[in-house]
């Protein structure tokens, strides 16, 4: 039987059904091919073609290539572990690719796998790569698969859940794995890899299941790219907020009594307050009204909103007598109650309610991660109630506010617009009008954006912002979401010029997103060296010796009265030690005082980078810092 195949150049050829992409690549003279894309599905070179299709080929230079070679590297890792620890002692979990790498989960019986073992595992992987074992894909019956994996309980569990009568397996040498692919043609294609770490991971992410050993790794087509990535990881580890947070006395975590619920220490609270004050100032200027809504509300509210039916597994509940309450996972129902507390005319719109609202959402312990993934967090949530004709201008206002806030921290960002999914509520004409309003607002703001067709929420289109930090990593933070569902569920209306009730449009919007997460991003973005305006301590006053302490106290008091956050370090430690401690604490400025300074009334100032400025007039120092703080400058003025 013949099938028609459209080639990369657009030409069409006929081949026998079962022809492999490798054979077509060889025939048309395309070299250095490692895989294929068949009708937008990643496809092994040795996997037969069964239908009419369009094909293009993947080389190591193509963006699809990492999915092939990192997936294969995960299998090479598993094969190496089984060789070293014994096939009978290793129970295999799963081994997928992830962003910039891969991992494999193992249940090691009669032994233990730690980070000290990674070098010898790497050596065994290099042997497997050198062996250049052919990788073969097979489709077999479930019964055959159960026989092959009869000693692999986790694989048997997966086989039971696969729909249909057949499954796919991959073989390389003595190693066989249950897998959908895709993979390289052999183990010797990519040689540049590194095993990175070992951690615990519950099977399938559930605390009810056994804890497995997860080994993380990365791989690249070029040695240079691997080396650059390892340097990037080294820098990222230095900036890790989980390390810097406690070191800088910003926050702490207690997994025994409050997993996923950060404790903010005095210095961390200063940063949070500065972030909130900055945001409040901008919101007041733009006509937002700040409100506070209850943390706990009756279950009936959450039944109306739909959270009870669709989000209950992520919520916390409280029962008291006959009543049942929920700890709020979102702020929107509370804001709707505020809106509905009085009659609203079209003349009152738009109404912009804003809240730093604490919410709680259950997350599995295995996915909790410092401040980035938590169970308790604060959202800078706002809800705008407006008429359909006001959507475009309101979105434009939010875009301007987002840009103002992100620019203040030196962030650039990327924008995505997600449109109507197949499963949606509301009239398609309303969706089209709303989506066009979002597009027009983005165009008027001059923002380039990518459209994600069909990726909107079922209750409305949305705009997402991905900020880029100093290491080039992207973080999804701000969201603008149009909602057609909540206003209908809660009968959110206004009296129009025709004296009739009309359903209001509701715009959800957050900019920091989670205040805690944004704080964590800032720690890593600035490596803990915050701009002076948000630095927990702005000036460290350091007397050279005990006899200079009284003079140092007077200087510290004077600076404090001028509104600066000052730390007087008059401990009986060496001067060098105290200066180093101030630098470790990332304090922007150090004022060092000895005989010369106290007699002249002029300051010796050091910046945290080590720059020294002598004979600084007190008034000049105060005026310079005040302007730096008032203008919320990113750089230290005295370093310029």
UniProtKB/Swiss-Prot annotation:
GO biological process: threonyl-tRNA aminoacylation
UniProt region (Catalytic), positions on chain: 240-531
Entries under Pfam families matching the protein: HGTP_anticodon, TGS, tRNA-synt_2b, tRNA_SAD
Co-factor note (free text): Binds 1 zinc ion per subunit.
Reaction(s) the record says it catalyses: tRNA(Thr) + L-threonine + ATP = L-threonyl-tRNA(Thr) + AMP + diphosphate + H(+)
Keywords assigned by UniProt, alphabetized: Aminoacyl-tRNA synthetase, ATP-binding, Cytoplasm, Ligase, Metal-binding, Nucleotide-binding, Protein biosynthesis, RNA-binding, tRNA-binding, Zinc
SUPFAM superfamilies per UniProt: Class II aaRS ABD-related (SSF52954), Class II aaRS and biotin synthetases (SSF55681), TGS-like (SSF81271), ThrRS/AlaRS common domain (SSF55186)
Cofactors named for this entry: Zn(2+)
Subcellular location: Cytoplasm
Recorded GO CC terms: cytoplasm
Entry EC number(s): 6.1.1.3
Limits of the TGS domain: 1-59
GO molecular function, one term: ATP binding
Residues involved in Zn(2+) binding: 332, 383, 508
Enzyme class, spelled out: ligase
Organism domain of life: Bacteria
Function: Catalyzes the attachment of threonine to tRNA(Thr) in a two-step reaction: L-threonine is first activated by ATP to form Thr-AMP and then transferred to the acceptor end of tRNA(Thr). Also edits incorrectly charged L-seryl-tRNA(Thr).
Known partners and oligomeric status: Homodimer.
Entries under PANTHER family matching the protein: THREONINE--TRNA LIGASE, CHLOROPLASTIC_MITOCHONDRIAL 2, THREONINE-TRNA LIGASE
Family: Belongs to the class-II aminoacyl-tRNA synthetase family.
The protein, known as: Threonine--tRNA ligase
Organism: Thermotoga neapolitana (strain ATCC 49049 / DSM 4359 / NBRC 107923 / NS-E)
């Amino acid at each position: 039987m013949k099938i028609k195949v459209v080639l990369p150049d657009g030409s069409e050829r006929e081949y026998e059904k079962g022809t492999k992409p490798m054979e077509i690549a060889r025939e048309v003279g395309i070299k250095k091919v490692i895989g294929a894309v068949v009708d937008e599905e990643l496809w092994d070179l040795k996997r037969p073609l069964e239908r009419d299709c369009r094909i293009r080929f993947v080389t190591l230079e193509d963006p699809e290539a990492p999915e092939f070679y990192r997936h294969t590297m995960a299998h090479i890792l598993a094969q190496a572990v089984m060789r070293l620890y014994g096939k009978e002692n290793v129970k295999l979990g799963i081994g997928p690719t992830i962003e910039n790498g891969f991992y494999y989960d193992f249940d090691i019986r009669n032994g233990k796998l730690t980070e000290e073992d990674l070098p010898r595992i790497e050596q065994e992987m290099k042997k497997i790569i050198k062996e250049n074992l052919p990788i073969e894909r097979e489709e077999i019956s479930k019964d055959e698969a159960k026989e092959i994996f009869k000693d692999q309980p986790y694989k048997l569990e997966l086989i039971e859940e696969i729909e249909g009568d057949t499954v796919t397996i991959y073989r390389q040498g003595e190693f066989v794995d249950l897998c959908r692919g895709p993979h390289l043609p052999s183990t010797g294609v990519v040689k540049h890899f590194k095993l990175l770490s070992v951690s615990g991971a519950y099977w399938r992410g559930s605390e009810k299941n056994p804890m497995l050993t997860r080994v993380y790794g990365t791989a690249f087509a070029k040695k240079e790219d691997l080396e650059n990535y390892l340097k990037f990881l080294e820098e990222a580890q230095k900036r890790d907020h989980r390390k810097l947070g406690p070191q800088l006395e910003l926050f702490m975590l207690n997994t025994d009594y409050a997993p996923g619920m950060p404790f903010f220490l005095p210095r961390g609270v200063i940063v949070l307050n500065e972030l909130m004050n900055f945001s409040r100032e901008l919101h007041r200027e733009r006509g937002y009204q700040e409100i506070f809504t209850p943390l706990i509300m009756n279950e009936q509210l959450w039944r109306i909103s739909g959270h009870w039916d669709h989000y209950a597994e992520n919520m916390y509940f409280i029962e008291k007598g006959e009543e049942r309450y929920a700890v709020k996972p979102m702020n929107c129902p509370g804001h709707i109650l505020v809106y509905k507390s009085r009659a609203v005319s079209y003349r009152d719109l738009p109404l912009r309610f804003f809240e730093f609202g604490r919410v709680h959402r259950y997350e599995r312990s295995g996915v909790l991660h410092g401040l980035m993934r938590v169970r308790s967090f604060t959202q800078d949530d706002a809800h705008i109630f407006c008429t359909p004709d006001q959507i475009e201008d309101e979105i434009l206002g939010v875009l301007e506010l987002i840009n103002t806030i992100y620019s203040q921290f030196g962030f650039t960002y990327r924008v995505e617009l997600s449109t109507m999914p197949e499963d949606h509520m509301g009239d398609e004409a309303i969706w089209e009008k709303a989506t066009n309003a979002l597009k027009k607002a983005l165009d008027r703001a001059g923002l380039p954006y990518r459209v994600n067709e069909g990726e909107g929420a079922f209750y409305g289109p949305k705009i997402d912002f991905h900020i880029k930090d100093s290491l080039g990593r992207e973080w999804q933070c701000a969201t603008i979401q149009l909602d057609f569902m909540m206003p209908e569920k809660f009968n959110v209306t206004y009296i129009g010029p025709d004296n009739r009730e009309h359903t209001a449009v509701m715009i959800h919007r957050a900019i920091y997103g989670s205040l805690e997460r944004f704080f964590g991003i800032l720690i890593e973005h600035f490596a803990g060296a915050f701009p002076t305006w948000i630095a927990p301590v702005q000036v460290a006053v350091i007397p050279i010796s005990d006899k200079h302490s009284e003079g140092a106290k007077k200087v510290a008091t004077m600076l404090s009265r001028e509104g600066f956050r000052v730390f007087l370090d008059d401990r009986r430690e060496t001067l060098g030690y105290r200066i180093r401690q101030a630098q470790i604490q990332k304090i922007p400025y150090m004022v060092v005082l000895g005989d010369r300074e106290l007699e002249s009334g002029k300051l010796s100032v050091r910046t945290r980078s080590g720059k020294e400025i002598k004979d600084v007039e007190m008034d000049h120092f105060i005026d310079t810092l005040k302007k730096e703080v008032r203008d919320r400058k990113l750089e230290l003025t005295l370093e310029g």
